[in-house]
Amino acid sequence: MLCDVYRSSKKADTYLYLPHGNEFTDVPDVLLGQFGRAEKVLTINLANREQLARLTVEKLQQHLHNDGFYLQLPPKREELQVNVNK
């Protein structure tokens, strides 16, 4: 399965994952308004991976299948501090 990844023009470190070729039809208008202009950054072949930076490919595929998209938000400040201290 191919997946397109878009970066938000309004929110730093915020990404929207969509099935390849999807025209944002499953993304709520409110979310698109807050997301801003979507800049495509890459296309990922999920068949070649098990893990992404913040979630498993299995979880991502579940979101894409059930919701039609996945919104990746920046990690919370506490999560960053824990990762730095490891």
From Swiss-Prot:
One family name in Pfam for this protein: YcgL
Gene3D superfamilies: YcgL domain
HAMAP family: UPF0745
InterPro entries in the record: YcgL-like_sf (IPR038068), YcgL_dom (IPR027354)
UniProt-recorded name of the protein: YcgL domain-containing protein IL1825
Organism: Idiomarina loihiensis (strain ATCC BAA-735 / DSM 15497 / L2-TR)
Lineage: Bacteria, Pseudomonadati, Pseudomonadota, Gammaproteobacteria, Alteromonadales
Residue ranges constituting the YcgL domain according to the UniProt record: 1-85
